[in-house]
Amino acid sequence: MYTASKERYTQMEYKRCGDSGLMFPKVSLGLWHNFGDTANFENMKKLCFTAFDNGITQFDLANNYGPEPGSAEKNFGRILKEDLGVYRDELIITTKAGYDMWEGPYGNWGSRKYLLASLDQSLKRMGLEYVDIFYHHRMDPETPLEETMGALASAVQSGKAIYVGLSNYDGPTLEKASAILKELHCPFVINQNRYSIFDRTVEKNGLKDMAGKLKKGLITFSPLAQGQLTDRYLHGIPEDSRIRTDGRFLKESTLDEHRLDQIRKLNDLAAQRGEKLADMALGWLLHHDEVTSVLIGASKPQQILDNVKAISCAPFTEEELKLIDEISA
């Protein structure tokens, strides 16, 4: 039986999620990869235990995480039942719905029927009565925003979620959604979006600025650009790289000579700062006031330990920030 470290809250730093009362660890653990049916269950447990022992209290899931869809929630539910569940009140457990999940017209996008059915399924897979945050996973161009936001509000009213969040939204849609949720007295606290030195979409589509204006949290996924912002590709593409075995999330064509040159220059800057590239990349995100937490993925416990070091990343000078922008342009 797992017993959590008594020192688990001594090193991690926590940040308020927007203007809510909820505190997030500056580093959170995502279960997007490495928690599906093809992964080793004992390793999954080690990842979760290492995270929690080091103050990571936020575990991020979605209905379709796997592979297969639903398997990450099922496996995490087993970890809760066998070990972590006794610490439930110390955990922030989140899930999402919005992508294709089951056959027929009711298993996708943002309808009230889909979202509430999906949440029920997620709770059953994890063996939970509620999640801390229920997200709509992506914007739906067809379903009225009022219906989707109303479904999120119903999830809270029914006691199946404490807070709600939005994922992969842009600034203008966030502003409209936030106004609807405020009218419904629904506790909307967080946005989740892809953001890294190499991916500035949230800067271009207004999401980051709008989150700050509305005083809502922002948790960033793919902060290391699927491993590009690490030392893994400094000397080209390793044969055992996920690119070689699974090109769904990072394509080999992305790592052309220009990108590899960018990675090497950023690595040189990190070395000048006395840091690893990954530490600098995570620290760069956390230096933005709008960013509440960075969402890391891991296949080995040591990766979690390494990423937690980012909270003590040295402050950036204006010259360094300008150079990062120039290199990554």
Predicted regions and their residues:
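Acidic-and-aromatic substrate-binding clefts and catalytic sites of carbohydrate-active enzymes
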Residues: 35-40, 64-72, 140-144, 171-172, ...
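N-terminal binding-site loop/beta-alpha segment at the start of enzyme catalytic domains
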Residues: 1-91, 157
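Hydrophobic faces of well-ordered beta-strands that scaffold small-molecule active sites
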Residues: 25-29, 59-61, 91-95, 134-136, ...
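Beta/alpha (TIM)-barrel catalytic core signal, keyed to glycine-rich beta->alpha loops juxtaposed to Asp/Glu
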Residues: 2-9, 143-329
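Short, acidic/polar
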Residues: 38-51, 110-126, 174-178
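Alpha-helix N-cap and loop-to-helix initiation/capping positions
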Residues: 39-43, 71, 75, 106-114, ...
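N-terminal small/glycine-rich loop or linker at the start of catalytic domains
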Residues: 18-36, 94-107, 130, 135
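Active-site groove signature of glycoside hydrolases
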Residues: 123-143
